[in-house]
Amino acid sequence: ESFGYMVGDFVRDKDAETSSLLAMNIAAEAKAKGSSFFKEMLKMYQEFGLYQEHLISVVKKGVSGAEEIAQMMKNLRENPVKTLVGEQVVRIEDYQTSVSRNLLTGEETKIDIPKSNVLIYYTDKGTKVAARPSGTEPKIKFYIGAKADNEAAAKDKVAALQADLEKLQ
């Protein structure tokens, strides 16, 4: 997916090569200390929580669809969401304006990467939702990241986020 993970900048492909190499490195280090990849993952879940991610693609065809998508992004910028699944939104990153705004303090910091029509909302409980129009298809994509103590709670939070996002459409 276009919202992938890159370990460094030495390989231009997201996800495939670098994430596989990172996973193999974790497994090798775990084995060297008498542990396993699985045990290390459980430790990370205990320390950092469990995350569940989901992609929602909303198709809006034709000229009117493109206008609807543009209006959705405009509304998200001009009337920011205050809560997601009952959690307070505490930070909004706007990659079109290159500004990250802390909603608790009002502090703004510069985002130092190329501009893009992307908004990311972060809550006080570690949930995040990113919105961006597709550059190649007539759709807007919402990337959901839910943090919880266990898998069932994370899945429930993703389902609740989906319901919240349907209200925005």
Predicted regions and their residues:
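Phosphate-binding and adjacent anionic-ligand microenvironments
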Residues: 1-132, 139-143, 150-156, 162-169
